[in-house]
Amino acid sequence: MAAHFQTWLSHLRFMDLSLLLLSQITPLLIAEWLSLEPLALDLHPFISLSFALPAMRQLFEPGVVRLLVWRRLDAARSLAGVVPIMAVPARWTLPAPSWQVMSTPYSPLGGMLLHRDHAAQALEVLRRQGPGLGVSALQIPDLPGDSGLLQRLEALPNRLGTHWIEDRRRERAFLDVPRDPAQLLQGISRKKMGEIRRRQRRLAERGGLQWRETAGAEVTSEQIETFLALENAGWKGESGSSLLALPHRERFFREMAESFRQRGELLLTELLLEGRVIASQFCFLQRRTGYIFKSAYDETYREFGPGILNKIEQLAHLDPSQVDRWDSCTQSGSYIEEIWPQRQRLVTGTLVLNPALDAGTRLLRRGRSLVRTMRGQLLTAAG
């Protein structure tokens, strides 16, 4: 008991929590955020400064997204963690308004940016101080199954007042890059590979077919404009879902892309026919992991599958000295599953922090479980 009390005191004594508006994010905090990333427990593009700040600025009305900030109470008040969060209404799994990690139509992964040496302490401070800031629960969508944060959340004691609830899980295509990337092409079914090669030959009959990869600061503004134009010229432009369809989407994309480009974490792969880009893939690279953010192709050549030809060439040119893994960032059922055999587990869950809300949540879940059991028994009896 004494040891637990001392641990509790240390959490409160050496770290605090605050909730900031976008207007309160200073240049100093931005610099600290950037410096925290190499020290983070988990890091992927969608919790990094280069994505999160443009999203907060461009995709939401003022005040919708807040920044949860952990600081150590040392002489420098060192930054220990940040996560943008937004309010969400009550739902059956959580019978009161709560918060969730910022989610956008362009966020295939969720998480928190926490210092690797202080992550457990940060979660304890969130448990203690979060309710006082109005954060009674925090939903985190699509956590990677191998993330350090998920491991810590799943290991939390299931005590009244605070616990981690897994709401759902899913899988998507993922790729571990082998030492010999040729193995990846050999792993594709003979029938599928034959079909891809036939399309490639037919397309090459129309002119010189070329593939190229451009990374970091070498990515040009012309390439970014080409990608945007390709996406907007297809069905996404017609449906109003392209990045160019609305000014705030375009502003977000341009600000975000330039930030990743300057950091050397942007990568484009392109398929060209007679020198003209007919497929473009916009990717990020962080911690030796690649992420496919968006793909676009010229629908004039749809019968040849230029998008999948672009991805096949990417597989053929993978460099295991540069990248260890690739995340497709797609929904289940994507065509990429035919050429990427591995799957990544993604978990969406809620960290409940308020004792009264926790008790109500547990009661609701027990009731729902009882209803399912009774329904099953009735169906069995009727059958």
Model-flagged regions — what are they?
Residues L138-I140, R212, R325-D327:
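Short catalytic-loop micro-motif centered on adjacent basic/acidic residues
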Residues G63-V65, H118, G132-V135, L266, ...:
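Short, high-confidence coil segments that cap the C-terminus of an alpha-helix
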Residues L109-H115:
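The substrate-binding groove and active-site-proximal loops of carbohydrate-active enzymes
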Residues M1-R13:
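N-terminal amphipathic/basic-hydrophobic helices that include classical n-h-c signal peptides
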Residues L126-G130, S136-P141:
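Histidine-centered acyl-transfer/condensation active-site motif
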Residues L12, D16-W99, D142-R302:
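A conserved beta-strand-loop-helix scaffold within acyl/acetyltransferase catalytic domains
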Residues L94, T104, H115, E124-R128, ...:
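Aromatic (often tryptophan-rich) hydrophobic motifs at membrane interfaces
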Residues A87, L150-A182, L273, S321-G383:
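Active-site/acyl-donor-binding loops of N-acyltransferases
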